């Protein structure tokens, strides 16, 4: 550990929501990223450096890397969504897109967007987190190279998940293993050898270290305030350790790398710390006769606002409903929940649902990504910036989203449907997360994997199977209807069904049944209704809404 008391760690968010949970394109290898890093610096006057504009990235991705345009936009927009923007700015962008009548007009608006070039290179590099194989590349260059790994956590500290995006030990190991390559990507071309490698005398610019703050942050003497890496590296007492020269205003790459390796430690606000020392939340009750005990924890009591995490596991056979300040702006993970109805009615930063079965999730607006993995027979209802799914079976998604839903690998029997519910604070929460009702791409998913035909991977819910979802809780707020309304085909189906009910009621009323006949008819209807409640699973939800004796 550095003698100055500085602690550095790898930021969680770039990996939680920035690393696509799918193997990256082969052209995102270090070999090609090095070429891109050199290329953009030679095109500074053409919208490539220090800011990379969408048309330039489209040219690089489609023309040189041979990526599809949709895939090029996906990575560009994913990174842009990680940038700091106000909700008002995001809503303004949604309004601009909603006013575009053609694809050409959309492209014209996108052409004005740009990202930080060096940070975007780092973003592309960390997509290797979910690389399936680390075999030697065709050009004979082993990638990623093996580096000294951080000390493995004890079994008690090790998180109970194999999801690398939610495993901060994987984040730390990835950065430590590939720190030299990350730094070399940030070097100016004249600081590299002909084979794109650094030397002992290579110098990094201040802009390069500022870009590295995308991945690394820290604190001093365990203070609660968190600083980006470049602010700590430029701090006067650390100039010798970080290798900063006042005269040249550059960093010695050799000294900076040594300082980073000496100072990097486990993220004190990451998922592992939350599981180990987070505050336990009594949001769920123990189901009688069940050996499963729900575990819910958060770090809101000790983490800065932008580092909030909530983890929940093994919620079983119950209704869990929360609208809480603890959830606001938090990264939330639900793991191994089954046969439950889970309502998280607060604006969330991100939501990950893993290994859950036979349950319904109703979520407040998700500012970044809603991701599902290895789930079966779920109904998910949410407004989100992006939905991505992998290894799901028989799941239905009622969503409102300004981005095309991503179908990654391993999915079966996926159903997409329009968002069909509301709660009183919904529109207020949407405004806080910068999510609008248009554009809405719920019915236009993007298949990222290459598994079978596109039409066999998903279906759109037929209007004849569509019903409104009612949230059975009272809250304060102004939203009294589904924001943005329903697509016309679904609205028409509801109207026809309602008309059928009116006709049926009129028929019963005009039948002039005797008192005994009415009694028999009522019993028949109640029995059929009860059978319907049981067959649809609604009986379980109604039972779980009744407070247990201990909770009442």
Swiss-Prot record:
Superkingdom field: Eukaryota
Name used for this protein in its record: TBCC domain-containing protein 1
SMART domains: CARP
Any single Pfam family the record assigns to this protein: TBCC
Coiled-coil spans in chain: none
Any GO CC annotation of this UniProt entry: cytoplasm
One Gene Ontology term from the biological process aspect of the record: regulation of cell shape
Record-annotated C-CAP/cofactor C-like domain positions: 304-435
Organism the protein comes from: Mus musculus (Mouse)
Broad class of where this protein is predominantly found: cytoplasm
Segments traversing the membrane: none
